Amino acid sequence: GRVKIGSRVKIGYFSQQHEGLHPENTLVGELNYDFGIAEEEARKYLGAFLFYGDEVFRRIGDLSGGEQARLAFLKLMLTGANFLVLDEPTNHLDIPAREAVEEALMAFPGTFVVVSHDRYFLDKVANTTAELANGTLREYEGNYSYYRMKKEIEEKEAAEAAAEKA
């Protein structure tokens, strides 16, 4: 098939490897470098992603994986993208950081597609679940738990139908 992306769709991508970060920059410096944001405004944004006080002057290369993930997510939000593709966004995150990401996504006015092994996270943020299997994409109108429930019903019905044919 073909996918046509609308002229007003701006795609943002969150990579679990955080390739878009510059290890030599400070957090404040990174926001200035990529977005031209001055220190005072950068501190406000960074605070919303749990970076406080002098932490904003740490080098990105010295951050933990979870801290880098939070910064990468902040940068993604600042791009103005209205369609997000998120590759394992909760990897390396502690509980407060994961909850901050959940809240940000639930408030996000656009569309997002998430690839994740974090079932709890998917239950919190997803309202549609897609399954790609055997070259077919199937859509389920619900979160991950709803998807699992529907799959169990389908599997049970398929097993019963097979037993009746035997």
Positions of predicted regions on the chain:
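ABC ATP-binding cassette signature C-motif
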Residues: 1-166
